[in-house]
Structure formats: structure tokens, C-alpha cells
Amino acid sequence: VDRSIFGWEVPASMFQSLNAFFIFTLAPIFAFMWLALAKRNIEPSTPLKFAIGIMFVGIGFLVLVFGMKSSSGIQTGVFWIMMIYLLHTIGELCLSPVGLSSVTKLSPKRIVGMMMGMWFCASAAGNFVAGLIARATASENISGAENIFSLAQKSAFMDVYTNVGLIALFVGILLALFSPLMKKGMHGIN
């Protein structure tokens, strides 16, 4: 990653705070937006919000690929890294709070706790898949020292991110298409 922006070198540790920054910044906006849409009777259903979130994750990966392709060398500009964090956080805000709320609303009262546990197990499975993607795009050697990767490796990384992005988009579109059926199964709970 080319971490320089406007002549300033962005500390690598700063990337760890981007997700939290975007969540704190955007969560109130999303909460207000969902309420405003609900007042106008145009709030997306829970399954459609999930679909939108998954599509934002896919778009995030594809935007990163675009950024990688647009950079002349092997390094990707910091702007593109910030964009993937932003887009993935938007996706997360369409999924996580909505999902937790849905679990409590849709689960029978006596097993809400167990269903919340299942929600977090699904999140753990997602983190496992994220680890597989990270392994497929790792740029460290066995000793752990950074290894400057080649253009061929960059191309392989772009292939992985393109595939993940396209799969996420496909799943999001599929979920959006089936969301009316899923909404009917929710028996009016949104």
C-alpha cells in the first residue's frame, strides 16, 4: 500500500481505526435514515437490507480491484484502502444491527439467547472465511518479514478480490430477488 496522501505518510496502525471511525460516524446517519424511510413507508425489508449490505461488501472488493488496476506500480493508493473500509462498513451497518434486532424479534422468547449465540457463530464462520481470503492474498514470507510482491502476485490478488466481489454481488442480488418471499415468512415483523 502506498500510504502517502498529500505528502503525509499514513501510519499503518491508523487503518485499524477506520472501521470504528466509520461506524461511529455513519451509525447515527443510518439510524436516522431507517426511521425516516419507515415514516414514509418506504423502509426496505430486513432481507432487503441484508441484500444491500452484502452488495456493498462486493462493491467494496471490486472498488479495491479498480484501485489496484489504476495504480501504475505494485502499490495501491491509500484512498482505495479507505474506500474498501468505507464500503464494507456501510455493508456492516446494513447487516449487523438489523440482524441482531431481527434475531430478538423473530426468535421464540424461550430461545432468544441461543439464537443470538447462533448469530455470533455465523459471524465467526464469516471471520473464518475472511481468514481464508487473507491467506490467499498474504504477502509475508515464512519468517514474517514483509515481502515486496511482484506484479504477477498483484494480479493473483486482484483475481481473488474480483471473485470474492462478484460472488458477494451475486449473493446480494439473489437475496434481493428472494426478499419478498422471505418477508412473507416473517409474518409482518420487520
Features from the language model and the residues they span:
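Extended, regular secondary-structure scaffolds
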Residues: 1-2
